[in-house]
């Protein structure tokens, strides 16, 4: 069997709600239609722990995050998921107990950071996730240290997306919150199409809001919302800003 078939078997086993360890995978597949799940000639005994172990090592060497993203994009293409708009965000997960970080050089650091769970008393890990606007399909997933800052995470992701987005003929947009828009990150995002919220820490933000309130030249949007568009250059990037009124 191939590495891909071994990984597929582990996923199917995990979805079987049997809570069986991996070394019992052959037992899990004993009464399953192997030819339908895989192909003719594949037998349950092929998924022994030696093959599964070698497959996990191969995935690790290739890069788990990279492999996940590549498979997710292929799946989206097959199902005709619209990938023009890609929403990027992070979540924090609070943890308890002791963790031995010395056991794995590649392990993330479980430590204190900005808690989105509102539990600053607990250590945490951070998960970065980018999903398609169409259906919310995850296409990027990466774990980070518990004290990783969104500004840094967004910068690195934007940098990695430049070439990927340019390979595609039609425009693709990175959608993220205000942590994407910093002077440091502007050197990267100027190479992308992006949609973000302008941070309130910028002095220009309240000035422009007051300006459009004075002008009152609103355009109707929907459900009681109105907007005014402002064309300007900022951080060396020609941009279109919208002020939304509700």
Map each language-model feature to its residues:
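Anion-binding and metal-coordination hotspots
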Residues: 1-246
């Amino acid at each position: 069997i191939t590495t891909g078939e071994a990984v597929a078997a582990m996923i199917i086993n995990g979805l079987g709600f049997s809570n069986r360890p991996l070394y019992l995978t052959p037992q899990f597949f004993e009464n399953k239609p192997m030819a339908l799940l895989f192909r003719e000639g594949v037998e349950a005994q092929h998924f022994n722990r030696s093959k599964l172990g070698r497959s996990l090592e191969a995935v690790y060497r290739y890069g788990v995050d990279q492999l996940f993203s590549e498979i997710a994009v292929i799946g989206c293409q097959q199902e005709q998921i619209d990938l023009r708009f890609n929403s990027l965000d992070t979540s924090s997960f609070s943890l308890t107990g002791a963790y031995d970080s010395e056991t794995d050089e590649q392990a993330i650091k479980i430590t204190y950071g900005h808690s989105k769970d509102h539990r600053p008393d607990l250590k945490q890990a951070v998960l970065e996730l980018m999903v398609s606007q169409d259906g919310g399909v995850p296409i990027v997933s990466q774990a980070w240290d518990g004290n990783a800052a969104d500004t840094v995470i967004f910068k690195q992701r934007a940098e990695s997306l430049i070439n990927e987005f340019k390979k595609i003929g039609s425009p693709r947009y990175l959608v993220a919150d205000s942590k994407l828009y910093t002077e440091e990150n502007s050197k990267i995002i100027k190479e992308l199409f992006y949609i973000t919220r302008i941070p309130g820490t910028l002095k220009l933000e309240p000035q422009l809001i007051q300006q459009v309130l004075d002008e009152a030249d609103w355009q109707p949007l929907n459900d009681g919302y109105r907007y005014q568009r402002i064309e300007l250059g900022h951080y060396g990037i020609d941009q279109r800003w919208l002020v939304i009124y509700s």
